[in-house]
Regions:
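Conserved hydrolase catalytic core segment
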Residues: 134-174
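Conserved alpha/beta-hydrolase catalytic His-Asp/Glu region
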Residues: 196-238
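Conserved acidic catalytic loop of the alpha/beta-hydrolase fold
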Residues: 95, 118-136
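Conserved HGGG/HGGXW glycine-rich cap/lid loop of the alpha/beta-hydrolase fold
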Residues: 11-107
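Catalytic active-site module of serine/aspartate enzymes centered on a nucleophile-bearing elbow/loop
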Residues: 287-318
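Short beta-strand/loop motif that positions the catalytic acidic residue
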Residues: 257, 263-265
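Flexible "cap/lid" loop of the alpha/beta hydrolase fold
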Residues: 162-193
């Protein structure tokens, strides 16, 4: 498939496209710390067969795009300490950036972020310019769904439709549910694995908590699916978390969006519970919502047919 590097906004963005570029474009934006290989071919090919041109790309700081963040101070220090002290340091760091209820808070680190979601939205729009794409159906997962909202707010003329998947209107909203305690513990353990250089194990540990009950986590299959993702370029130290924390909550602005919008969310999402997706749907006028029962913070391959059918219907009606 055609692929390349777009030099935009003083960084490089790696991209790959599928299908006839004269067809309507679907722009796929992945979530935090995840490169575009997590949009699998099995998800992309049916969209191409339905008559769409599909573009996936690596956000800044992951994959083959420019990495602006490398290993952080806490990680470097933790490597030098005994395991028990490293675990205490990591627990302390998580307590600094979360409140008593498990909400991520705007930390000092976030206030010094090198970029925010508006910069990442500009990357996506600039990539469209580079590829000669005027408008696209914008689909984003998790943080990618947040970038999708920013495009709808700040660059509405570039979007044919919006689809935020397992996403949120923003952090720090006291009316919305928080992460589960089990996920927070899983994140701490994953961070320890990353420090020890066990990056794949770190990803596995997180996804065990993110997977819902409908399709139980299969570690062997997951590791096999993650091989191309890890080989493409996994940056566990990306600044995506800081970018989310440095960005304003969009909930009060969602009413400004006047684009066909489909919100997709699972009922067992441990990091961004269902009410985050519902808040997006409630905030954007005339939006639709697809609720995936028993699904966590994931797009299970078992639901590809159902999800893609709904997406194609959404795109064609836009």
């Amino acid at each position: 498939m055609p692929q390349g590097i777009a030099e935009v906004n003083e960084i490089n963005i790696w991209w790959e496209d599928f299908g006839d570029s004269s067809n309507p474009t679907v722009l796929l934006i992945m979530g935090a710390n995840a490169n575009c290989m997590q949009w699998p071919i099995e998800f992309i090919n049916p969209l191409v067969e339905a008559g769409f041109h599909v573009v996936r790309f690596d956000n800044r700081d992951v994959g083959k795009s420019t990495w602006l963040y490398k290993e952080g101070f806490i990680s470097k220090i933790a490597k030098l300490l005994p395991l028990s002290i490293s675990k205490y340091l990591i627990s302390f760091a998580f307590n600094v950036v979360t409140d008593d209820e498990g909400n991520f808070t705007a930390s000092e680190q976030s206030s010094k972020a090198k970029y925010d979601l508006s910069d990442m939205a500009k990357d996506a729009v600039s990539l469209m310019d580079h590829l000669g794409i005027d408008k696209a159906h914008v689909v984003g997962a998790s943080m990618g769904g947040m970038i999708t909202q920013v495009i709808g707010l700040d660059h509405p003329e570039r979007a044919l439709s919006l689809t935020p998947i397992m996403s949120s209107p923003g952090m720090g909203d006291p009316e919305l549910s928080t992460m589960t305690p089990a996920l927070i513990e899983g994140m701490k353990e994953s961070f320890m694995m990353n420090i020890q250089g066990n990056y794949e194990d770190g990803v596995v540990r997180i996804y065990k908590e993110l997977t819902g009950s409908r399709f139980p986590f299969n570690e062997e299959n997951f590791r096999e699916k993650m091989k191309p993702v890890m080989e493409h370029g996994h940056n566990p130290h990306s600044g995506h978390g800081d970018a989310v924390g440095a960005s304003p909550n969009r909930r009060s602005r969602l009413k400004e969006i006047n684009l066909p919008t489909l919100v997709i969310h699972g009922t067992e999402d441990a990091i961004l519970p269902l009410d985050h997706g519902q808040a997006i749907a409630d905030g954007i006028q005339n939006s639709q919502m697809m609720i995936m029962e028993g699904v966590g913070h994931e797009l299970p391959e078992e639901l590809n047919g159902e999800v893609i059918s709904r997406l194609v219907e959404h795109f064609k009606s836009a």
